[in-house]
């Protein structure tokens, strides 16, 4: 069995359920035991009219739009459902770096992959919204096809047609990170965050090796095109829902992880958060919700 087919088999076995936490008072080796939501969420920041982004991700891609959160200071977070993952959109902030271009142009969160059952229906929605039809290409050794398009802000999106047409296959969302040092990034997502490393595969789209990490129905994939790319630290990031954000903060201190925003409480939402950076400055945002907090072991 090829590594690619092994990855597909692993994804087919994905199920959705909260993960248990370690006993009270124990310090876990990584964040894994306090990851509560059996998926990750992903956010993108943009600099175009919000309506254009909402039309693309909702009307064209067909993601279900949820309520928009107003988190204060005039900041709205638009939310879309993609399988078990929430895909979030918000305007750019001023204290981060942004780089134009695609997956090879900068380090950062450079690609989001969504799964679709029907190429014809997806293509029809592109045409109905006045957009060129995506150009699909076969992935050698599989029955899948992919197309690369840009959203209205110029950020790349991969459209994957999956022949399985099962909920498990269609619920998968893949977050593509371009990194400067694969070993440092692998260590962060494996040894600090506690994601399951699936092993490298040859990347049929961008070339080289791709290192993937699984949490429930969400994949984080790492690619590297050298150490000298400019850093994009603002265009996107990953959110994890956890049962104990204090433990995340303690682990971050112990492992010398960069803190982007310290522990804080978001008024009106019963939400406690800490924002951390991976080795390339990509935001990893840990949120303790009231529901997750109640799940802690006694």
Regions found by a protein language model. Give the residues of each.
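Core segments of cupin and vicinal oxygen chelate
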Residues: 34-36, 43-87, 144, 176-219
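Bacterial N-terminal signal peptides that target proteins for export
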Residues: 1-9
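Bacterial N-terminal signal peptides
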Residues: 9-18
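Vicinal oxygen chelate
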Residues: 23-35, 37-48, 77-81, 98-171, 176-177, 200, ...
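Short, low-complexity disordered leader/linker segments with a strong preference
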Residues: 6, 20-25
């Amino acid at each position: 069995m090829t590594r690619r087919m092994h990855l597909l088999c692993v994804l087919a076995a994905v199920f959705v359920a909260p993960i248990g936490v370690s006993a009270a008072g124990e310090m876990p080796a990584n964040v894994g035991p306090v990851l509560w939501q059996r998926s990750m969420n992903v956010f993108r920041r943009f600099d175009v009219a919000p309506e254009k982004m909402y039309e693309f991700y909702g009307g064209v891609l067909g993601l279900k739009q949820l309520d928009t959160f107003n988190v204060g200071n005039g900041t709205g977070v638009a939310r879309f459902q993609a399988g078990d993952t929430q895909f979030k959109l918000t305007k750019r902030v001023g204290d981060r770096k942004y780089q134009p271009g695609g997956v090879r142009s900068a380090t950062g969160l450079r690609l989001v992959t969504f799964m679709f059952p029907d190429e014809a229906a997806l293509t029809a929605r592109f045409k109905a919204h006045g957009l060129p039809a995506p150009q699909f290409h076969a992935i050698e050794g599989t029955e899948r096809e992919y197309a690369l398009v840009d959203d209205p802000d110029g950020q790349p999106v991969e459209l994957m047609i999956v022949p399985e047409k099962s909920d498990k296959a269609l619920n998968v969302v893949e977050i593509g990170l371009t990194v400067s040092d694969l070993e440092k990034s692998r260590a962060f997502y494996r040894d600090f965050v506690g994601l399951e490393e699936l092993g490298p595969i040859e990347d049929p789209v961008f070339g080289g090796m791709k290192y993937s990490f699984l949490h429930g129905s969400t994949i984080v994939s790492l690619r590297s095109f050298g150490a000298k790319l400019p850093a994009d630290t603002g265009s996107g990031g990953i959110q994890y829902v956890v049962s104990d954000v204090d433990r995340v903060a303690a682990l971050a201190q112990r492992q010398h992880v960069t803190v982007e925003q310290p522990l804080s409480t978001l008024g009106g939402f019963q939400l406690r958060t800490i924002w951390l950076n991976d080795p390339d400055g990509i935001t990893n945002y840990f949120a303790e919700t009231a529901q997750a907090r109640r799940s802690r072991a006694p």
